[in-house]
Amino acid sequence: MQMLAQREDKLINQDWSFRFSHQVNANAARRVDLPHTWNAQDALGGKHDYKRGIGNYTKKIFIRPEWQSKRLFLRFEGANCVSNVFVNGKHIGEHRGGYGAFVFEITDKVEYGKENTLLVRVNNGEQLDVMPLVGDFNFYGGIYRDVHLLLTDNLCISPLDYASSGVYLIQQQITDKQAAICARINLSNGTGELRKAVLRLQVNDEKKTVYETEKEVSMIPHTDVQVENIEFILKNPRLWNGTQDPFMYQTVVTLIKDGKELDKVEQPLGVRYYITDPDKGFFLNGKHLPLHGVCRHQERAEVGNALYPVSYTHLRAHETTLHLVC
């Protein structure tokens, strides 16, 4: 009997402590939950005098002893705009840029069976080497999206390539009759030995598996990102159209060793082709499509850009009244 994939994704948004860097007194810290911004109240007034500086987020997290057989990663979905991450006082890494996710591995940085301290130092001050420098929006400071603790096997689909899923689906040639796709899969071997494994790729529609294949791979020791490609063709694909038929296939990539599923990633796939003509406009799947859009910033009153799921619900409800074509 085949065992299930071992990846675990733990949301660690609750019970953080926050204070500004100039608040040296520990009593100045206050409890916050993520997502969080320190500009929720002062940035929406239309002025440029809102707080821009350094904020410190700390969290105690117990690392279970049985996790010693795993690999541990911290995934940040958004923090603005320069973030430095520390574990137990040791610097893990820096991310520069406020509008992209980032991941750091902490496997050998934590103490197992003990409480560990995370510190994230976020700076939304002006950075001349970090884009954008100006904009018609506020540069909110804080960890304004979710933070995850990822646990994987020593052999895994790598989350270390710019915090991607590790599965890239490259649409090489698309027509109404067939879709030629290349799946670029990033693997990672955290051990010191060459390991043999099997990659299984499945493409599912709403009811069944429409394509399946397997590939044997040799995983190089101590490798953060090892690229493996699997090319495949979908016959008579169901084409994606954002307004009429926003259907997406689900591509499931599984890493298997000795009959055991070590890791699994699901990646949506919207098959489509398009062209733009300077005189005739935009064509999606061979049909002319007028494009309309608006400028909608990621912010809400009282919370700034630290959006919760209910915030997205409200924003999407409003977008439907604008007849957006995405």
Predicted regions and their residues:
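Secreted/periplasmic carbohydrate-active enzymes, especially glycoside hydrolases
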Residues: 1-316
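Single conserved hydrophobic/aromatic residue that forms the stacking wall/gate
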Residues: 314-326
